[in-house]
């Protein structure tokens, strides 16, 4: 990841894309993903999120856990869904990008929730 604090953004380095986000994706899918990646603003990462039980607390929460994720390792994912409990945790044996590597399986999980 390339940080540019003066300009207010971060950029993913191309050499880190496959091992971090797409290690179980085809080269064709990785090329497609690259076309859609852009700069990420830094400012939102440092602004606290404020929610209320009345609004955010009333929304059903389900977590899709990616067991082969190298960007958000499973231990960190577990910490996230433990600190903000979810009704259900669905585990997938994929990288950070199940929408690229296992779209059918992901769609089936999402459809099962409706």
Segments (PLM) and residue ranges:
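Short, hydrophobic alpha-helical segments
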Residues: 110-114
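Conserved serine/cysteine hydrolase catalytic core
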Residues: 28, 35-104, 108
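Helix-rich cap/lid subdomain of alpha/beta-hydrolase
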Residues: 1-53
């Amino acid at each position: 990841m390339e940080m540019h604090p003066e300009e207010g953004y971060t950029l993913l380095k191309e050499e880190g894309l496959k091992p971090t986000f797409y290690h179980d994706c085809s080269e064709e899918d990785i090329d497609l993903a690259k076309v859609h990646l852009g700069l990420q603003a830094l400012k939102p990462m440092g602004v606290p999120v404020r929610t209320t039980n009345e609004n955010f607390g009333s929304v059903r929460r389900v977590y899709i856990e990616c067991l082969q994720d190298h960007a958000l390792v499973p231990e960190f994912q577990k910490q996230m869904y433990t600190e903000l409990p979810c009704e259900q945790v669905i585990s997938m044996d994929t990288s950070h990008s199940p929408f690229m590597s296992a779209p059918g399986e992901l769609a089936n999980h999402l459809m099962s929730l409706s």
